[in-house]
Every structure is written in structure tokens, then in C-alpha cells.
Amino acid sequence: CMDRNGNGRIETSQDANGNNLIDRGNPNEFFGQNDECYAWTKAIGRSGGTARALAIDAGDAQNPYGNVWVGMYTHREFYGVQGGDGTLIQRQGLQNPISIGHSPYGAVVDSNGYVWSGTLSGGTIVGFDSSTGRASGVIRPQGVPARSYGFTLDGENRLWVGAQSNGVNRYDPYHDANGNPIQDPLAGGGEWRNSSCGGHRCYMRGAGADAEGRIWFADNTTGMIGYRVDTMQLIGQFSIGGGTTGAGVDFNGFIWGVASGGYTGRIDPNNPNDVRRVTVGSGPYTYSDFTGFGLRNFTAPRGGYKMIIEGCEKLDTDWMTLNAEATLPPQTSIEFRAKVAESRDILSDPGLRAYGPWTMSADGPTEIPADLAG
């Protein structure tokens, strides 16, 4: 978020009256394009392209928070845009947009920078190299149901597909059915596997993998279904009601299901009896990595650490400088941010100004120590 008007606060859409809704007709709650947490808004692609797939990569020197790949369902192509300002990515040898062989409906970027997309109903997968634009052919299901909806990946770069009423499919572009490595993941020939819904009626849609070796699918009939990512063994079903289209993992390990009936449900996978449901408004809909957990754990692993430092108890404290020391492996970096407030309660205010970021990099100059007095 950026303080564009320089008033020392972040002005972003919020629930000002405490009724658990953001009223789009109330200018004190909904800021529209003046929301300072909107980085940019761009029209992507040709008219009628129908954007139905979006994934964020690990970024580059110019866009360290990631670049965005937008898949056009009707025109069967992907546009790569810079995360910083939404302009088209321009690289030597990269033709942008990138033509692919099917209609993308959901996309992910793996840890090696390959962009993968599923499609609606047919079960096919197509990938391409985000650096060069070199694309695979259409990878068709082998020995598994040719059905698809939601699309995600796990920590081993295996691709998962919600196979509608036929459970879930998994495709490994890096290993064949005998476990042998595949040198070129775009060449095809990877292992396909399927796991059923355990005899239950189901309709599998969006999905998200957690950090504990499990993957969670939105079951449109009852709620959520979990599997082990390595064995594809079914863990169980969790009822939050019908109409669930999206499944996501948050950074505290809870599993969230988004239901088109106007609510979201939260599951504690370590306590199956702790299932909560909250009304959120009319027709919420998603089937992708809506929490960013997959991006920050599988595509571009990152972590965070927060620390509160208190000033002198009996005297006023002026915070002047932020300094730090770190041991960094090659090609890694740390970003520092700081907030200053009169009390701990004020620190939690989302509108409080954040200083920074300042970067300490293993491969380049450092911006630490940093000035807090400005």
C-alpha cells in the first residue's frame, strides 16, 4: 500500500461501522480506484479474450514481488505483465502474448518458473517457460478421468486437478510412472494418477495445498475434502454446506472454503470438530490461490518475522535508526519494514504508516542501516 496523498495514513476500503460488510455505496467504507492498496488497474489482452487464469511468478530484479501471467480462455493465450505497473513483459526472445493449445481455466507457476494451466472440463494441461515462452503441447489425461475444474500445485511441483464428480487427478511433469526423472518438464510423459472421493458423491472444484503434506479440495456438494499429497490417500470430508467453489490455506494453517451461497467456512485440520461458517455477502466465487499461501510456500518461498521493541518506560523515546546483521545464502535477501507508535494497540492499526522497505541482499548493496527520523 502507498500513501499517495501524503496524509500519513493508508486509506483503504474497510468496515467502518462494524457490520462485517464493506458497503460499496458508502464512500467512508469503499474507496474504489482511490484505494491506496490498489497498485494499478489495467485492461489485458484483446476484446473478448475472457481472462480466466491468473498466476504470479517469483519476480525479477525490476519486480521483486512477482510478475503476473493472465490466461485468456477464448483466445488461448497468456499475457505476461510486470507486477510493478502492469506493462507487458519484454524480454529478448519472448513473444508476448504466448499462444497455447487449450483454453486456460486456472494457472500456477512452479518453483522452476514454468507456468501451468488447466482447463474447464477436458482435463488437459499446458505449460510454458516464463523466461522464453517455449510451450508444451497439450498434455492429455492418461488412465485417469478426462474431467477438470480447479487447478493447483503442491510442494513437489506436482499439478492437481479437481476432476469434478471423479475425485482428483494429479500430474507430475518431472517424473514418469516409474519414478524416473524427466529432464524437460514440457516434453510430456509425466505420471498421471487419480483418487476418488471415497465412495461419496462429490463435485471437485478449487484446491490448495498446505505445509503439512495435505491438499484440500472444494467439494461443491458438501464442503471440503482432504488428501495426502504423496499417497493421494483421502483424509476425510468436512461439511460446511453446498456450493463450495474455492479452497485456500491461510498462514496459520486453517483451511478456508468459499461458497457461492454467500458464506465462507473455516476448518481446523487438527481439530475436525472446529468448523466455522460466516456470512460474507452475495455470491463469492474463487477457485485459485486466494490467500497467496501457494505463491509464498511453493512458487517463491518466503517467510516473515515480527518483533516489537519497546522504548524507555519513564522517558520519551525517539526512534532514529534501524540496524541489523544477517547471514544470507546466495541469491537471497531480507526486506525490513518498521512502524512507530505510542502504544501496542496503535501498532495494529492497518492505516499506520510503515517505513521502508529496506533491503539487505546477499548479492548486492545493502540499505541497512536505515533512517527512521525522516
Task: State what each model feature region is.
Residues C1-N34, P181:
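Acidic, glycine-anchored loop motifs typical of Ca2+
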Residues Q33-G45, T87-I98, R134-Q142, G179-G198, ...:
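A short beta-strand motif characteristic of beta-propeller blades
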Residues N34-G59, S99-D110, V144-E156, G198-D210, ...:
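Repeated scaffold domains used in trafficking and secretory/extracellular systems
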Residues G59, Y73-H75, T119-G122, E156, ...:
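Short loop/turn segments immediately following the C-termini of beta-strands
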Residues N63-G71, Y79, Y114-G118, R158-G162, ...:
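Conserved beta-propeller blade signature
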Residues Q82-G86, F128-R134, D172-A177, R228-Q233, ...:
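Short loop/turn segments that connect beta-strands within beta-propeller blades
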Residues A146-Q237:
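Eukaryotic tandem repeat interaction scaffolds
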Residues F251, A259-G261, R266-G374:
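Beta-strand-rich ligand- or partner-binding modules
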